[in-house]
């Protein structure tokens, strides 16, 4: 076994109120895919937390639950997961949806380039050969296709999927003083695109790998309620701000 396989690996799953889909996600985790799972849930009831803990007790991977009484935002939730991972000595984090759009059985696709090939950041892409997408909402599908084109133009780094939240990275990137994820303007969807831009432009070794993105016909919770029409600036803003030097 490669020595890199012993790097502690954490799965971070941000969730908004949802329990039913999260339970489905947890059942797909296989032993030793990651060392620990950190669920960060906003606005969960006592019953929600009970169901999460009951589902967590049935799998072989340790699960830590962080519960926020108020809705903090997906960026805030991911940051809490990152902070937890850093505090527990994890070296790699996998971030994924808690609403059953991402398949934990595909986590090795994201981890292999980091563990065996020296990559710092691996982005899952539904558009690469071998990737899969089903039931994508029309507007979101169009936006997801077009947005990487503008990222490629702006960063000079070719990419095929930017809005897919299924990705993995070495936690050491956050020790770089040029990356400051602890800014309040990153509490919502902005954080993911902030990290993406920094990795693209600061010389970290990154690649894309094919993954699946399967949308349910109706989806609630799990921080999947993003709308390109309503939330477009939270998605586009980090690229504009950082490119123009307005934000750090």
Where are these regions (language model features)?
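A short helix-to-beta-strand connector/capping loop
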Residues: 7, 59-63
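A conserved acidic beta->alpha catalytic loop
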Residues: 41-52
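Short, high-confidence coil segments that cap the C-terminus of an alpha-helix
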Residues: 34, 90, 118-119, 204
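Acceptor/aglycone-binding surface of glycosyltransferases and processive sugar-polymer synthases
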Residues: 70-72, 76-87, 104-189, 216-226, ...
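Short beta-strand-to-loop acidic/aromatic patch adjacent to the donor-nucleotide binding site
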Residues: 90-101
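Active-site beta-to-alpha loop of glycosyltransferases that engages the nucleotide-sugar donor
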Residues: 13-27, 43
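Hydrophobic helical membrane-anchoring modules
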Residues: 1-8, 20, 27-28, 180-248
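Short, acidic, metal-binding catalytic loop of nucleotide-sugar glycosyltransferases
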Residues: 27-36
């Amino acid at each position: 076994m490669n020595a890199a396989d012993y790097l502690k690996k954490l799965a971070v799953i941000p969730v908004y109120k949802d329990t039913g889909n999260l339970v489905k996600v947890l059942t797909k985790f296989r032993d030793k895919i990651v060392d620990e799972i950190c669920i960060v849930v906003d606005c969960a009831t006592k019953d929600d937390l009970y169901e999460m803990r009951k589902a967590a007790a049935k799998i072989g991977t340790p699960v830590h639950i962080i519960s926020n009484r108020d809705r903090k935002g997906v960026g805030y939730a991911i940051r809490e997961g990152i902070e937890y991972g850093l505090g527990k000595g994890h070296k790699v984090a996998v971030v994924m949806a808690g609403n059953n759009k991402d398949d934990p059985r595909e986590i090795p696709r994201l981890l292999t380039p980091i563990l065996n090939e020296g990559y710092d950041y691996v982005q899952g892409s539904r558009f690469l050969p071998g990737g899969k997408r089903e039931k994508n909402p029309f507007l979101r599908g169009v936006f997801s296709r077009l947005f990487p084109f503008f990222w490629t133009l702006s960063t000079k780094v070719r990419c095929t999927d930017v809005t897919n939240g299924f990705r993995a990275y070495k936690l050491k990137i956050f020790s770089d003083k040029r990356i400051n994820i602890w800014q309040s303007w990153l509490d919502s969807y902005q954080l993911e695109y902030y990290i993406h831009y920094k990795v693209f432009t600061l010389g970290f070794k990154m690649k894309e790998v094919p993954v699946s993105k399967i949308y349910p016909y109706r989806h609630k919770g799990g921080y999947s309620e993003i709308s390109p029409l309503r939330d477009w600036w939270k998605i586009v803003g980090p690229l504009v701000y950082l490119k123009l030097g307005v934000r750090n």
